[in-house]
Amino acid sequence: MTSSDYDPASEGAETDFSRRMSYGDYLALDAILGAQHPLSEAHDEMLFIIQHQTTELWMRLAIHELSAARRAIARDEVQPAMKMLARMSRIFEQLNNAWDVLRTMTPSEYTRFRSQLGQSSGFQSRQYRLIEYLLGNRNHAMLKPHAHDAEVTKLLEAELATPSLYDEVLRLADRNGLTMPAAVLSRDVRETHSFNEGVLQAWRVVYEAPETHWMLYELAEKLVDFEDYFRRWRFNHVTTVERVIGFKRGTGGTGGVSYLKRMLEVELFPELWRVRTIL
């Protein structure tokens, strides 16, 4: 028998799904594969749509993992949280690799359908904004693009009222023997955490004696590992946009590359990066 003659039913594989849930049913593939609606005849618009749709799917998983990691840390369940953070790094490794596919589209090819995008832009992504808020970058101005959608605004406002992932990590560290500044522990969580010398010195204790504070040391390195991948994703976003549109304004009205470059300056866990300088 050749492979072309092989019938999986001969070994007991199920082939009748008239009354059973199939692979496509479970994954709702009809809905997913029917969600691409190019607005032009340009061949490369399909690539552009699928690139962004798959990014949104990975972000859906990222939110799932980050939210669970934050809950686990708040309950002192650090080992499961570290597994989730490790997965977050792999998710953003996947997202970084995806830029290579989009870079196969040239400026000439993009201009054939760019006008069809109207004012839509990636900075309007509600999931990306939720990830930024979860991680502690709490720019209230970024609520404005969602003001037309009451449900999304409610979701983002609720996240702003919740301690960020890093807030929970600092509280965990305080519960486990590090002395975190009271002003940091009691701060308004709706605002972005800014660098604090007391937090830096607390992490210095961990990094100067990792064997004594192994759990916190390992957790800190998981955070740094993740932010490393996240920074690379932002950088790849900048270089891809510059490669495709140069320094034109973004479709959403931002400065395009100049806006994205400002995002490269954002530090999610500033003390974990600066502690390396003082060791």
Swiss-Prot record:
- What residues does substrate bind to? 48-52, 110, 114, 251
Which keywords belong to this entry? Dioxygenase, Heme, Iron, Metal-binding, Oxidoreductase, Tryptophan catabolism
Q: Which cofactor does it need?
A: heme
Q: Which reaction does it catalyse?
A: L-tryptophan + O2 = N-formyl-L-kynurenine
User: Would the keyword Cell division turn up in this protein's UniProt record?
Assistant: no
Q: What NCBIfam families does the entry give?
A: trp_2_3_diox (TIGR03036)
Its protein name is Tryptophan 2,3-dioxygenase
Species whose genome carries this gene: Bradyrhizobium diazoefficiens (strain JCM 10833 / BCRC 13528 / IAM 13628 / NBRC 14792 / USDA 110)
Q: What broad taxonomic lineage does this protein's source fall under?
A: Bacteria, Pseudomonadati, Pseudomonadota, Alphaproteobacteria, Hyphomicrobiales
Per UniProt, what is the name of the gene that codes for the protein in this document?
A: kynA
